[in-house]
Amino acid sequence: MSRLSIAPILFAGLMVCGIGMGCSGKKSGPEQKPVYKVTGSITVDGNIPDPPIQIECHSIDSLEDLNRTFSSAQSKKDGTFALETYKEGDGIPAGDYSLTFSWRKFDLIRRQHSDIDLLKNRYADPLKSETKFTVDEKPTDLGEIQLKTK
């Protein structure tokens, strides 16, 4: 094959790759903020929770901000957790936060958590949360968070 006959094929291949990359469905968004590790552990009535606790992190300064980051975690089998914003266990941006907790069994048939919170929604309101903390530009250990069902 001559160089002239390869050029159109090469050009067409590059165009297909470029179109595929441009139409990949990935949304562009705001720049990712720097994050800092936040870890801790959870007990419920003095015991390691099973099923795991779902943890949501709420920025106190931006509860109404539509561009805020969303950070969360799920407790592990040993009761420990690491908050995440962009990928597993990466941390959260610096700031002031409150945590909310829910404890729901996972329904394998429906492939989702049940509607019943075993903590009776006691820890569901970020404005009433007793677990508040500040993340400076360094790792933060929240220690043991003790939740109660009664």
What is each model feature region?
Residues 1-11:
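Bacterial N-terminal signal peptides that target proteins for export
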Residues 15:
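Flavin (primarily FAD) cofactor-binding/catalytic cores of flavoenzymes
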Residues 19-22:
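C-terminal motif of bacterial Sec signal peptides marking the signal peptidase cleavage site
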Residues 24-150:
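Beta-strand-dominated extracellular/periplasmic modules and repeats
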